[in-house]
Amino acid sequence: LGQDWVEDTASFGTVTIGCARLQACVHHLERSFAERPLRKTAQSGNFLVAVPEGAQHTLGAVVLAAQLRQAGAVVKLVLDASAEHMSKRVKSEQFQAVLISASIGQNIESLRQFVQASRDRENQSNVIVGGSLLSVQSDLNARVGADAATNKWQEAIKLGLRGLPCRQVAL
């Protein structure tokens, strides 16, 4: 589906419907996972997975949330979240990590503001960015002020569960 989009052999409608169906499949699989015990190597942790307001790409975040849950983590997923919503959310709930989806085409400055709003007052939550934007921005975490950047869910768990020093935004 993604390759067809890149090669311009699939219409916007086809890709949108295909992604919606894939998300429905993920939700169906999550229900069946809930009926089975977690893996023996289950990870604990409390994560917030967020897709910034206006982003059109949500499938990766939905899949990430499902993978984290299957690994034993407690996960909250917010789609189309504003910076204001994130600021309120991290002040009212404690998360070990906030995982932010960053898509190609996303404005770096607005993403930096979103990352900043996603920090709790005490900077105890690690803020980790991932997504397609990493393929074109190797220094993304430094540019937006995140603690780390990865597209590997296993690495996100490890980074989220250990204390990372908060980095200053590189201007």
Q: Where on the chain are the PLM-derived regions?
A:
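Long amphipathic alpha-helical segments
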Residues: L1-E35
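Long amphipathic alpha-helical segments with strong coiled-coil/leucine-zipper propensity
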Residues: F33-P37, V49, Q56-H57
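Short, flexible hinge/linker loops that cap or flank conserved catalytic cores
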Residues: K40-Q43, R121
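Conserved hydrophobic helix-helix packing surfaces used for dimerization/oligomerization
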Residues: N46-F47, V98
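Short, charged N-terminal beta->alpha structural module
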Residues: P52-R69
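Cofactor-cradling patches in redox/metallo enzymes
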Residues: Q67, K76-V78, S82-L140
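Peripheral docking tails and interdomain loops at the edges
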Residues: L133-S135, D139-L171
